[in-house]
A protein has these predicted regions:
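Surface-exposed, charge/polar-rich loops and edge strands
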Residues: 1-408
Length: 408
């Protein structure tokens, strides 16, 4: 697969912590506004610029993208972000509690994405993809990196270990306690070696950022069509990503909450559930293995165990698929979890206490605590050209936006 160093923009050293922000899609409007509060340099003002616009502004309007461009250009004009003197790559380490992961920051080929050398496991939602496409096209900037992974056992592991001995470009701990450390790789011979290493890696997988990667590839096709002298070397043919060895990743569960029992009484619901799976009262709040789900209902925890799963394909045997096919759809009437407003999803970073809180508040009737999907499952499904159910994986920690910017 193809990989390339880039001559991008980045924060000046003492502004990295002020600029770096969470990705656009892990916060709602109110949370985005709160994240940027008291932080005039926050990149949240670029990736979610609607937080600065008048109330009632359509979040997918051109006014939002134009304002994002103004905010981005202001960061550059005021000297808070600077362009590298020469093409480079970076190593990016994140430490959250006892977990550490280090990835390589570079640009990856939109052509590889289109040809499934970069493999996907999720469908995109049209409105969300259009939103990121218009932002990227208006700014001519990759505002946030795509989160990629490759199988273990490549030379990428050695690159990561060798570079971490050098002085860091950035090293700060964010408000949420996650430490971010960045090293720059600018030596031409090292960069050339990395390109050759990736020549021998057959594929990568989108772990997180399907809407970003799809919109970036779409931008590449747009600018190619606009350019009669297109050669393939232009910067728009490449998009910003961070790639991690699979063994370093931490996937947390992506839990479910449903607003009502679809007209069932508690007793009727439990009776139907008992026919769909093995049901036990007083279970642990988090399941201890696959084919198991913990459920919180009316102040009590129950254990659900799915049986008769032999012979199911890689997608149908996922816990999120078993729950959807045997409980959410037939009993609770959740036909399409992508669009049904009766269901919501809670990232595992919030823990089971959040599930109890949501149900106890009566905003939701029932919560389901999942066992995490594995990286091996993700890669097997992508290799088979299949699609995972929505909200199957929650990666943590999240890559920050604003630490690296690729322009084209």
């Amino acid at each position: 697969m193809k990989i390339k160093a880039f001559k991008g923009l980045r924060p000046v050293k003492d502004k990295a912590a002020d600029i770096a922000s969470l990705p656009y899609d892990v916060v709602n409007f109110e949370q985005a506004a709160e994240q940027a509060k008291g932080k005039p340099l926050s990149f949240m003002r670029v990736v979610r610029s609607e937080i600065e616009l008048p109330e009632g502004t359509e979040p997918y309007s051109q006014a939002v993208y134009d304002h994002a461009k103004e905010n981005f250009e202001k960061l550059v004009k005021n000297g808070h972000m600077v362009r590298e003197d020469a093409p480079c790559m970076y190593l990016y380490r994140q430490v959250m509690g006892g977990h550490a992961q280090t990835g390589l920051v570079a640009t990856f080929s939109a052509e590889d994405y289109d040809n499934d050398v970069i493999k996907k496991h999720e469908k995109t939602r049209e409105a969300k993809e259009n939103d990121r496409y218009m932002l990227t096209r208006t700014l001519r900037v990759n505002t946030g990196p795509v989160f990629l992974t490759v199988k273990d056992g490549t030379e990428l592991d050695k690159i990561i270990e060798n570079k971490k001995d050098s002085d860091a470009l950035f090293d700060f701990t964010a408000d949420d306690g996650i430490r971010h450390t960045v090293w720059k790789i600018s030596d031409p011979s090292t960069l050339e070696k990395i390109v050759k290493i990736f020549d021998a890696i057959p594929c990568a997988y989108v772990a997180d950022g399907h809407h970003r990667s799809a919109s970036n590839a779409r931008c590449a096709r747009f600018f190619k069509a606009q350019n009669p002298g297109h050669t393939g070397d232009e910067d728009y043919n490449w998009f910003l990503s961070v790639v991690f060895p699979a063994g370093q990743l931490s996937i947390l569960p992506y839990n479910r909450v449903v607003r009502d029992l679809a007209g069932n009484t508690k007793e009727q619901f439990l009776e139907k559930l008992g026919k769909a799976c093995r049901l036990e009262k007083g279970a642990a709040k988090s399941p201890d293995g696959s084919k198991k789900v913990s459920m919180y209902l009316d102040g009590e925890w129950y254990g659900l165990t799915f049986e008769n799963t032999d012979g199911l394909d890689a997608v149908s045997s996922l816990d999120v698929a078993l729950l959807q096919d045997r409980v959410l759809a037939p009993i609770l009437g959740i036909g399409d979890p992508r669009t049904d407003e009766r269901i919501d999803f809670v990232g595992g970073i919030k823990g089971t206490a959040e599930l109890e809180k949501l149900v106890d508040s009566k905003k939701f009737a029932v919560a389901f605590s999942m066992f995490p999907t594995t990286t091996d499952q993700l890669m097997a499904i992508a290799d088979a050209g299949q699609i995972m159910p929505p909200k199957s994986t929650w990666f943590e920690p999240k890559l920050r936006s604003g630490l690296f910017v690729h322009t084209f």
